[in-house]
């Protein structure tokens, strides 16, 4: 199983790039069933600490299906969302589910082409 980060995820954290080791930890936790919300269609919401604890950290939208790869699709800093308002709108959620379905259907050749085109990058985790 490979772990990939899509370009929108990295772009949203351009100034506060999240270290790959934190992405690996978040991926391991999600695979172990530790996540904030299952949003359906293989889409999950996961908190990632940015140094000041998880409550003030980042939120990742992750596509994962058992026996498939894991994709960090999008993300945002918790501080950018207003409290009391739904963080992910229904139309965004439907789009994430569609994207997840397309990602799960990718062939190895399509994955390589996406990496070469810099649409996503692979994260290498130790152990």
Give short role names for the model-derived ranges:
Residues 15-16, 21, 25, 30, ...:
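Generic alpha-helix signal with a bias toward terminal, lower-confidence helices
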Residues 4, 56, 91, 95:
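Charged, alpha-helix-enriched surfaces in structured cytosolic catalytic cores
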Residues 64-127:
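Enriched for short, Lys/Arg-rich terminal
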Residues 3, 7-49:
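N-terminal first-folded block
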Residues 1-18, 112-127:
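Arg/Lys-rich, positively charged N-terminal/basic patches that mediate binding to nucleic acids
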Residues 34-81:
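Basic/aromatic recognition patch in beta-strand/loop cores that engages polyanionic ligands
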């Amino acid at each position: 199983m490979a772990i990939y980060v899509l370009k929108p995820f990295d772009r949203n954290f351009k100034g506060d790039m999240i270290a790959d080791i934190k992405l690996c930890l978040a991926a391991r936790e999600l695979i172990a069933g530790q996540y904030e919300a299952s949003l359906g269609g293989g889409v999950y919401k996961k908190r990632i600490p940015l140094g000041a604890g998880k409550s003030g950290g980042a939120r990742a939208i992750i596509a994962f299906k058992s026996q498939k790869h894991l994709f960090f699709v999008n993300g945002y800093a918790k501080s950018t969302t207003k409290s009391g308002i739904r963080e992910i709108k229904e139309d965004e959620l439907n789009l994430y589910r569609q994207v997840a379905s397309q990602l799960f259907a990718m062939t190895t050749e399509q994955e390589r082409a996406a990496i070469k085109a810099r649409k996503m990058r692979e994260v290498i985790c130790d152990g």
